[in-house]
Amino acid sequence: MTEPTQPQAAVAADENQIVAERRDKLRALRDQGIAYPNDFQPTHHAAGLQTEYADADKEALDAKALDVAVAGRMMLKRVMGKASFATVQDGSGQIQFFVTPADVGAETYDAFKKWDLGDIVAARGVLFRTNKGELSVKCTELRLLAKALRPLPDKFHGLADQETRYRQRYVDLIVTPETRATFRARTKAIASIRKFMSDADFMEVETPMLHPIPGGAAAKPFVTHHNALDMQMFLRIAPELYLKRLIVGGFERVFEINRNFRNEGVSPRHNPEFTMMEFYAAYTDYRWLMDFTERLIRQAAVDALGTATIRYQGRELDLAKPFHRLTITQAIQKYAPNYTDGQLSDDAFLRGELKRLGVDVTQPAFLNAGIGALQLALFEETAEAQLWEPTFIVDYPIEVSPLARESDTVAGITERFELFVTGREIANGFSELNDPEDQAARFRKQVEQKDAGDEEAMFFDADYIRALEYGMPPTGGCGIGIDRLVMLLTDSPTIRDVLLFPHLRRED
């Protein structure tokens, strides 16, 4: 039978008592003038020692007599009379300290017995293996570097409340190895992407985060004010138009990994600020982009995880296999096979079906929607969530692709794709529209939609049109959601799990 938990008030009272006791200990350290020393430099890290000497037996280590200096957070402590043990965790892993009064002195040993879990400690000593086979540091010098005033969560239960894990990520990182592994994998994936891009002769650039005109995506921006210039500014929703200005300027391959901001809802797939990579390559098209993106994602998985075969939410996913490619209508008919070609070309039927599925077709975005936009909406309701294996959905309608090049063979269709994996969009790319007159006409259409109430429609960017008028070579461009990619690679069900500090409501 499960024991009843303490009332929250009692837990808070206990924690307050612990904090008060630890403050008393800190006060004593201050009185001695040794509260927060900063003169210790580690020579080794726990993981490095564990790896290098994993196969060394007790006799070999005794013969080597390796001197080490290690520092970290004390996670466990066992005081056993004339010999004590502490498990210390640094940024790489854990190692055991072996402490005796004979080695560190009676005064230091007595002080050590009063130290608390969570304290930052340091030791110099000799690496050895205990009789039970545990690789350890036999401490000859032991110091307290930083006093932890707040207690760590119970080691068996950790941070049980999910929101507390997000809000106090610093504690989550201390006590949850899986969280640390997630963010190490994220770093490896991004490093892999950067190397992949560099090896393909792309130049990494930085473009503005504050825009005078929001553009490059259909989204609602955050608005701010520049006091010195007395002008309204927008946090960027996408870097696209600036990156394509660089293509005009002669940089033929560019990419940027940075934050975008969208003043929209929070969900398992959405955070108001998020990390994207956008890249643009002159003299390429959307077919080249799909091949390139597929290779990039596969390599990121291998570099981050050591394999292209991953597991996500209990299901295996082989990123080494060729990614699927389907048109919007092919995807609908694959996952909702009852729809006929005639129905998918019938405006009234599509509107009725969307309404039946719970879509509000009276909202501004649908008022003048054509067949293509209605098909896309139906795809989102019937097929998108079922695209488990990597799938490029291609040939998006021109009315929802204001920056993409129109197909040379099919009227009303653009050379655009979106990549879906596990039912989520991971990437969006297309052959870029480089005709300034066509682009200006599409911007004007977007302005009409905005005036009709569509808050996500684009503004008219006159300077971008001016840039295109200087001539932009045929170009392909793609954006990859880094956060969603990391969710996939780390088996994380929500975007908050892969953001160090996700957005949350104000704390009460």
Swiss-Prot record:
Cofactor mode of binding and number, as noted: Binds 3 Mg(2+) ions per subunit.
BP GO terms, sorted: lysyl-tRNA aminoacylation
Keyword hit for rRNA-binding: no
Highest rank taxon of the organism: Bacteria
CDD domains noted in UniProt: LysRS_core, LysRS_N
Entry's localization field: Cytoplasm
Catalytic reactions of this protein: tRNA(Lys) + L-lysine + ATP = L-lysyl-tRNA(Lys) + AMP + diphosphate
UniProt binding sites for Mg(2+) 2: 425
GO cellular component: cytosol
Record EC number: 6.1.1.6
UniProt cofactor(s): Mg(2+)
Molecular function terms, GO-annotated: ATP binding; lysine-tRNA ligase activity; magnesium ion binding; tRNA binding
Record keywords, A-Z: Aminoacyl-tRNA synthetase, ATP-binding, Cytoplasm, Ligase, Magnesium, Metal-binding, Nucleotide-binding, Protein biosynthesis
Chief location category: cytoplasm
Quaternary state and interactors: Homodimer.
Database matches in HAMAP family: Lys_tRNA_synth_class2
NCBIfam families hit by this protein: lysS_bact (TIGR00499), PRK00484.1 (NF001756)
Protein name: Lysine--tRNA ligase
Organism: Burkholderia pseudomallei (strain 668)
